[in-house]
């Protein structure tokens, strides 16, 4: 590619870091780095009522823990109100948007985009050609007022000003794409290339959601359970993508080297915690012995072992290093029995 590749990850800090969003961040990172490009981060916090600092910190901390380093100073939409206002005023001045008096809802006035009512098509890297008749969208709302932009306007302006070349996101955003293309054309922006990823599904093929599946949809849940960050990345990379070989265990560097967006599947990918367990075990085996011993014994509290049992498993003449190796072997045996 002659143009520098720039991808973005734009989470909303309205809840714990969802495992589906982790995969979206990963695929954006892999694609950018595979092409020698930049992976940028922005926080979409226009929902003032639901956005919280603790969720933003959780997202930033999660990305750092996973080793997905961004290449910019993270931006926040809440700090760019003046930028959006400038575009809104220009759209209104050019009669591409207008103030609408509403008869329903809490807002008496909103700003609507003047829909040119045409067919929009784009070539999706995962799904091929996608077409929409935008007449069905009507004149859609893009802001509550010039100081309160809504999602569709803010995301388009941010992508445009950041020079984003590729928008890689979940398939639940496909219906947003025609609106965003219309807005982008109205402000004179160049269209990015789109790739819409298959959803991550539960075992019953329903979409993973906190409401239905609880805390098990969050990154922190797996971090607290002791999974390695590299194992989580490895497993998530295989949800909707494969390298075209039988290889299943990858380091992050190997994923960057092998990642090919053309190998992303269209159908939903089922999250299987047992498979994650296996991937995690394989990554533990790859650790240097010292790291492996520390990892597998860090939560072992000898004081909590009943005295009769302690006398059977402890040897007064055994060094600390030998004891660690014994415990490591015991844990490995238990793990294998559990399989």
Q: Model-derived features: where do they sit?
A:
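Acidic active-site catalytic centers that drive phospho-/nucleotidyl reactions
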Residues: 18, 44, 139, 158-159, ...
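Residue-level signal for inorganic ion chemistry
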Residues: 28, 59, 91, 113, ...
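Active-site cores that bind ATP or allylic diphosphates and position pyrophosphate for catalysis
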Residues: 77, 97-212, 218-219, 243
């Amino acid at each position: 590619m002659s143009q520098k590749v720039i991808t973005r990850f734009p989470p909303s800090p309205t809840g714990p870091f969802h495992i589906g969003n982790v995969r979206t961040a990963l695929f954006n990172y892999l694609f950018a780095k595979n092409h020698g490009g930049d992976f940028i981060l922005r926080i979409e916090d226009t929902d003032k009522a639901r956005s919280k600092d603790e969720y933003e910190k959780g997202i930033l901390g999660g990305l750092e823990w996973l080793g997905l380093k961004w290449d910019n100073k993270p931006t926040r939409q809440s700090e760019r109100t003046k930028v959006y206002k400038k575009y809104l005023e220009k759209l209104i001045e050019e009669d591409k948007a207008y103030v609408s008096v509403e008869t329903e809802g809490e807002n008496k006035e909103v700003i609507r985009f003047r829909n040119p009512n045409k067919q929009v098509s784009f070539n999706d890297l995962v799904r091929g050609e996608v077409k929409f008749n935008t007449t069905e969208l009507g004149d859609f709302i893009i802001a509550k007022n010039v100081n309160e932009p809504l999602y569709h306007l803010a995301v388009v302006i941010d992508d445009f000003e950041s020079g984003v070349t590729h928008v890689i996101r979940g398939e639940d955003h496909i219906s947003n794409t025609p609106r965003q293309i219309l807005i982008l054309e109205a402000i004179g922006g160049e269209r990015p290339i789109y790739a819409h990823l298959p959803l991550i599904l539960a075992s019953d093929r329903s979409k993973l959601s906190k409401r239905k599946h609880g805390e098990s949809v969050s990154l922190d849940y797996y971090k607290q359970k002791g999974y390695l960050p590299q194992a989580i990345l490895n497993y998530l990379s295989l949800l909707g993508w494969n390298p075209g070989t039988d290889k299943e265990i990858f380091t992050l560097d190997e994923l960057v080297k092998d990642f090919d967006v053309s190998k992303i599947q269209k159908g939903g990918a089922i999250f299987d915690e047992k498979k994650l367990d296996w991937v995690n075990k394989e990554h533990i085996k790859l650790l240097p012995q010292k790291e492996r011993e520390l990892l597998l014994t860090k939560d072992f509290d000898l004081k909590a072992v009943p005295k009769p049992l302690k006398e059977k498993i402890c040897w007064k003449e055994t060094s600390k290093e030998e004891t660690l190796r014994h415990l490591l072997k015991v844990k490995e045996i238990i793990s294998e029995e559990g399989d």
